[in-house]
């Protein structure tokens, strides 16, 4: 049934994304952005006078962070400013902001006026979404609310390089909002700008929504929704708000410009505070930082070194390698998995066979280690090792079933699959005489099933094949087994 939202009002959505940049040090000081591998991230251990906002300290711009925002701007078809990029102070008070202001960009951002084509599977079409800006700023500290009348502040996150990406109000449905977020995350991961992990807060997303009567060109009262920890939450929050706005408009009620939070358990939004405007933050130029002027030569170097973007990679997989749209989508949704697949193919394996194994059994094993944060490129079994195993299967030297057993062994050990096959005696049996004897033994052992098959019960055939494979520990050549079984059953 059509709702008031779909029949009388047009949904207008703009999206803001904050993504932590993949740098080793913070935005304006030399403190590390993460704890050393294998060590606990103790609170307030990755701090210095600069990121704690001590008087007399001066910020120094992180060149790598600037490069990653330029790379993002290129990927989003933005204009990259070369004349004067200005840092500004965004003034507000909150316990997680040690200086009492945040160094950001406002009037003169690094990247602006971009555009992104977004496939929307739920609508069966692509939409073009304008990118207003992509700029640099510093992250805030992390508050830990203990529920005992006070909160704790961990300043390890304070000063971590942050990129804010803001869209034009071009999004017209909750499904488009979700698709935009997923597409942007894939791009950021492919170009190495951010890990895009919403679970850890390294990528945070907010939706701004309003409704207007169909055919109108103005804008309605805008509401911002926060506390969105997944793209699914974004979609559901926008659906809820669209219906809430439509119902209020139908009743003639005035909507309030405000910030609301998404209640995942309740499936609704909750009012948090009135929505701030830009002038509430009293932006003014950061006096401790000169204007930033990226050279055209440097921007050209970054452009020339750009990795393949997800859309181009997906097209290559489908048009050049002949993969299905589904397999291409699964691979490009995980840049590490796609990189692993490319190396398997480079090792001489056919693309379709490689895709079957990488998106199938290999991904299943990878998902078992999801809690450890293991990525495809970090697995002990190198792509060349998986290519060796697939080659053994394609060459008929090991069965698919036994190959899965081998993969489970070498996935974590990194051993040569060929060595494991030989050591465990898992190689495929091609001895026609042996297979003939094993088939005869199975038919003698199961006379009732043989009679049922010969009486027309075709599904018994699979049972008989399974018994032959069981007697040979899964090593018999399936093609020879089928041929011999047919010969003896029909002879």
Locate each region found by the language model.
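Strongly charged, low-complexity linkers/loops
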Residues: 373-387, 391, 397-471
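Basic, nucleic-acid-interacting segments
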Residues: 1-308, 319, 325, 346-350
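C-terminal non-catalytic interaction appendages of large macromolecular assemblies
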Residues: 155-160, 198-205, 214-217, 428-491
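Extended, non-catalytic structural segments that build the interaction scaffolds
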Residues: 298-305, 312, 342-349, 386-398
């Amino acid at each position: 049934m059509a709702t008031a939202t779909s029949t009388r009002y047009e949904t207008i959505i703009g999206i803001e994304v904050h993504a932590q940049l993949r740098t080793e040090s913070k935005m304006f000081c030399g403190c590390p952005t993460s704890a050393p591998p294998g060590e606990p991230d103790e609170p307030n251990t990755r701090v210095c006078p600069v990121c704690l906002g001590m008087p007399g300290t001066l910020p120094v711009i992180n060149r790598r962070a600037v490069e990653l925002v330029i790379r993002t701007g290129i990927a989003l078809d933005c204009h990259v400013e070369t004349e004067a990029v200005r840092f500004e102070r965004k003034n507000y008070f909150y316990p997680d902001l040690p200086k009492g202001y945040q160094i950001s960009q406002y009037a003169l951002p690094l990247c602006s006026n971009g555009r992104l084509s977004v496939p929307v599977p739920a609508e069966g079409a692509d939409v073009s979404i304008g990118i207003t800006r992509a700029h640099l700023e510093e992250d805030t500290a992390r508050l830990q609310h203990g529920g005992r009348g006070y909160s704790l502040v961990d300043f390890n996150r304070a000063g971590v390089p942050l990129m804010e990406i803001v869209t034009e109000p071009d999004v017209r449905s909750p499904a488009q909002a979700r698709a935009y977020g997923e597409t942007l995350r894939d791009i950021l991961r492919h170009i190495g700008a951010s890990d895009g992990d919403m679970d850890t807060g390294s990528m945070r997303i907010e939706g701004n929504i309003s409704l207007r009567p169909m055919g109108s060109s103005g804008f309605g009262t805008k509401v911002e929704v926060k506390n969105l920890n997944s793209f699914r939450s974004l979609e559901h929050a926008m659906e809820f708000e669209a219906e809430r706005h439509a119902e209020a408009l139908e009743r003639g009620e005035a909507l309030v410009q405000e910030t609301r939070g998404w209640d995942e358990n309740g499936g609704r939004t909750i009012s948090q505070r009135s929505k701030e405007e830009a002038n509430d933050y009293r932006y003014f130029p950061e006096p401790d930082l000169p204007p930033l002027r990226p050279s055209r030569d440097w921007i050209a170097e970054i452009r020339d070194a750009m990795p393949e973007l997800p859309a181009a990679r997906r097209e290559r997989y489908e048009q050049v390698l002949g993969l299905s749209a589904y397999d291409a989508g699964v691979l490009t949704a995980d840049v590490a998995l796609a990189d692993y697949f490319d190396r398997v193919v480079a090792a001489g394996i056919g693309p379709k066979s490689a895709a079957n194994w990488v998106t199938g059994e290999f991904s299943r094993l990878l998902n078992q280690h999801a809690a450890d944060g293991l990525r495809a490129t970090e697995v002990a079994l190198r792509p060349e090792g998986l290519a060796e195993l697939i080659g053994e299967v394609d060459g008929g030297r090991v069965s698919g079933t036994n190959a899965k057993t081998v993969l489970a062994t070498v996935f974590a050990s990194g051993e040569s699959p060929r060595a494991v096959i030989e050591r465990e005696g898992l190689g495929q049996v091609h001895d026609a005489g042996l297979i003939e004897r094993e088939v005869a033994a199975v038919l003698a052992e199961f006379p009732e099933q043989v009679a049922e098959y010969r009486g027309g019960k075709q599904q018994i055939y699979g049972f008989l094949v399974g018994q032959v494979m069981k007697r040979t520990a899964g090593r018999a050549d399936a093609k020879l087994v089928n041929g011999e079984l047919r010969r003896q059953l029909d002879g």
